[in-house]
Amino acid sequence: FDSHTSDLEDVSRKIFSAHFGHLAVIFIWLSGAYFHGARFSNYTAWLSDPISIKPSAQVVWPFRSIFGQEILNGDVGGGFHGIQITSGLFHLWRACGITHSSELYATAIGALVMAGLMLFAGWFHYHKAAPKLEWFQNVESMLNHHLSVLLGCGSLGWAGHLIHISLPVNALLDAGVSPADIPLAKDYVLDAGYMAKFSQLCRGLNPFFTLNWGVYSDFLTFKGGLNPQTGSLWLTDIAHHQLAIAVLFIIAGHMYRTNWGIGHDMKALLDGHKGPVGEVGTGHAGLYEILTTSWHAQLAINLALLGSLSIIVAHHMYAMPPYPYLAIDYPTQLSLFTHHVWIGGFLIVGAGAHAAIFMIRDYDPAKNVDNLLDRVIRHRDAIISHLNWVCIWLGFHSFGLYIHNDTMRALGRPQDMFSDSAIQLQPIFAQGIQSIQAAVAGSAQAPWVGAATSPVWGGDTIAVGGKVAMSAIPLGTADFMVHHIHAFTIHVTVLILLKGVLYARNSRLVPDKAELGFAFPCDGPGRGGTCQVSAWDHVFLGLFWMYNSLSIVIFHFSWKMQSDVWGTVYPDGSVLNITVGNFAESALTINGRLRDFLWAQAASVINSYGSALSAYGLMFLAAHFVWAFSLMFLFSGRGYWQELIESIVWAHNKLKVAPAIQPRALSITQGRAVGVAHYLLGGIATTWAFFLARIISVG
């Protein structure tokens, strides 16, 4: 750690080089996933029957049956025994048009080549040709390249892949052609004879340049909704979307002024922006300098946006499943939702952390007088006290509804409960949004669209292979109540993180916080009430509330989908949901949530011993242990451990086996860091085991 430097150019070069290393790790990881798909998976069998065969790409090898661990290889259908996977890669590969393991091998090797290139680039751009600081601060060129090249050309390339490879292959697969009879992509992508089978591909680019775009409407569609055969978005709709996105981003990448004297100048934009209403001082003046000299500030904004985007992706993945047969693979749907929600939560907490680090290390009050940031900091008391009031209001009222319901149900007075069958609290605004979205197709808002974006808004159930792919999601009193719990927990998380940022440099209690740094345990001895007040401690506390918030979110999602959406569709069209619609009545009380969700659904993981799911039973216990271990760090005082260590050192000295280095107890901050890490690891792994054992056993 002696190599730490505050030289901005050197820091920028190190970060830039590390990015290439990070990309190399990602390519190696992806290569491993594709190699497993090619070598150890049942992908080709799944491709021939994605309804009754489950995805598997891991087979536990028997170790002379000493342990008997091959019990974990469950029957996933088609005579294949292995561990059921829930990554969604099989569905993605089918959407890509991959039909042979050789294509997966080629991609895996290609990813390793790319990893090697990235490692070389990381070395080259640090040791041989490191960019100058001016290059890192040239934001207009950066925006143009990221928008036009990365997002624009990236989307254009994916649109091209969808049109030339995915659409023909998926058309054949949907028509029942065996994957073995479909040629490799490399054999037909340039074969005019093959393309002639799909007449729309043979019209060339002439209609494009003559603006006669309508002739492409058979593979660039506006159908809307889901494909009833695969339960996913229409691939032709996706191709249309990606092409449109590509055009928009390529245009967007020409907006900023570089070598030619046209386009926006980012500094002029920010300096000139005063806001829509009233007098807000100097507006955004000074923000350009902040964002080009503080990578913490830049990172904080990017993390907040990317984290929010990840949570939005989580919702789109189930409402508008993008890949064929993804919607009927319930374990994968639950895993993808949970994964994207948690990733989003961690990134948003990271945004709070780096914003606070910026405030302490990079913020210069003298350069920010009466601008937007200065004005926010100066009325931070009003912001935080209002946010605190909102949290108190939401907490007491939302939790109070549950307390009321538990009390009434306990006393045998169901007619006095808040429920759909007694005192109704209908989410009328959410229901209004649903009805607007359900009716949007063909209306003035979307005249050319054939159907609403998804059946979730209201509409017919889409059944694939006797399973519900997607159906309307009814909202009622139970949803209204838990949504206010979501509002409460999210607002508390925001309160903690924002307070950490706005009071990072000073507060009435500790005026010299900026001198003490990002992480300090307490403001010295003899100064009560100043522990857990540093910016780092706000991140520490924010992590717990983030975990708390998102646990309720994923529990809500898991139970709601099992209750009201996922299930079996019978030949007469009737639907039997997994938990037979019990969410609306049971989720109204705390007791109901414990009894009918946590306890009832934990039966799968608790009773998993002796089955292929038994590893989840072991994981469930081990993760509980890790979680409980964290409490030892979170509840302890440092003095206890130091005193214990000193008595142990005394015993070693008596036996003349004392080490030369005197051991020390963890610092308060270290103890908290170890505590929160194990708390989150234990909690997440417990939930992982609970969810997967449940949904694999019933899904």
From Swiss-Prot:
One of its GO terms (cellular component) is plasma membrane-derived thylakoid membrane. It comes from Prochlorothrix hollandica. InterPro entries: PSI_PsaA (IPR006243), PSI_PsaA/B (IPR001280), PSI_PsaA/B_CS (IPR020586), PSI_PsaA/B_sf (IPR036408). It is a multi-pass membrane protein. Chlorophyll a binds at M632, Y640. GO terms for molecular function: 4 iron, 4 sulfur cluster binding; chlorophyll binding; metal ion binding; oxidoreductase activity. PROSITE patterns: PHOTOSYSTEM_I_PSAAB. PsaA and PsaB bind P700, the primary electron donor of photosystem I (PSI), as well as the electron acceptors A0, A1 and FX. PSI is a plastocyanin/cytochrome c6-ferredoxin oxidoreductase, converting photonic excitation into a charge separation, which transfers an electron from the donor P700 chlorophyll pair to the spectroscopically characterized acceptors A0, A1, FX, FA and FB in turn. Oxidized P700 is reduced on the lumenal side of the thylakoid membrane by plastocyanin or cytochrome c6. The PsaA/B heterodimer binds the P700 chlorophyll special pair and subsequent electron acceptors. PSI consists of a core antenna complex that captures photons, and an electron transfer chain that converts photonic excitation into a charge separation. The cyanobacterial PSI reaction center is composed of one copy each of PsaA,B,C,D,E,F,I,J,K,L,M and X, and forms trimeric complexes. It is found in: Cellular thylakoid membrane. This is Photosystem I P700 chlorophyll a apoprotein A1.
